Amino acid sequence: MAPAQQRPTVKIAPNNPVFDLPVIVGIEEGLFARAGLDVSFSATYADREKDSAERPIMARLKEQMFDCGSADSYNVCEWASIDRLERGKRGGNIAALRASVAAQAILSFDDALQVPRDLADVPVMVQELTGSHYTTVQMLESAVGAEHVKIEKGGLPQMRYAALKNRATRAIAVMEPFISLGLKDGAHIIAASFYRGGEVISPDLTPEERKAYYDAENQAVDMINADFYKYAHHITAHAKGALEPRELLRAFVHYKHVDYYDPTLFNRAYDWMKARGLSEGQSQHAALVVG
């Protein structure tokens, strides 16, 4: 193993821990170091707490750090990975579909809201232009019609869950650990949808560095799948003590090796975005995606 000062440095801007778990495990277990890389986070999860619903999209922590060059990579939902590269000034690529396969679930404590059709004209709190937003539109537009899908802008998932628990909103979309926490607290699921994310990377990373990084991340996935609850505390830490690691359900997140973002999947996502005014549609797969 090369000394740290001789290894290429890869800085990761943090997303939610449920999405970052393979990176966390890869660092913790020394997998990146053994692959010849010096991988670390460019900020803490506490730093992410400063993001708010009012903050412009490209001023959010991970986007801002990547765009200014303080981070070499971050993950975000599939649709947002396209959006952020189109909005950003730095340039970059989508190198893979991320290892985390997670659900967004629409939760409520309101007995009047039981199935997706009950959400016609009912605001669902999401974080704008993130997985919670895109999947909520997808879950509801076939049930109630696009004109009856109502989106309420909220902040990070813990903020949305607090709003739900305080009855400041009737329905929210969240991922783990807030799905498990919501069920523990007596909320119910109205709808849920699994989705992948995109790994946004700097154009400065070489193909060899990318391969070493994702090979190590895939090893981390294997370790997570072999002993999920050894690492579950990293996810439940997001709930600030309200959920024990063993209370985290296995049903709403799993992990697999990263995949190439092929043109068919890209075009389906991109066409969906264009049809809803979520992209001007000026990009091509070959311009945004590397493999």
What would you call each of these model-derived segments?
Residues 38-50, 248-257, 283-291:
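Short linear loop/turn motifs
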Residues 29, 65, 84, 122, ...:
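Structured segments of extracytoplasmic/periplasmic soluble domains
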Residues 207-280:
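Secondary-structure end/capping motifs
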Residues 151-238:
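Pocket-lining segment of extracytoplasmic ligand-binding domains
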Residues 4-144, 151, 170, 190-192:
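Short, glycine-/small- and polar/acidic-enriched structural segments
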Residues 2-4, 208:
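C-terminal segment of N-terminal export signals and the immediately downstream linker at the start
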Residues 13, 18-21, 98-109, 183-217, ...:
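Periplasmic-binding protein-like
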Residues 12, 16, 59, 99, ...:
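Solvent-exposed, acidic/flexible segments
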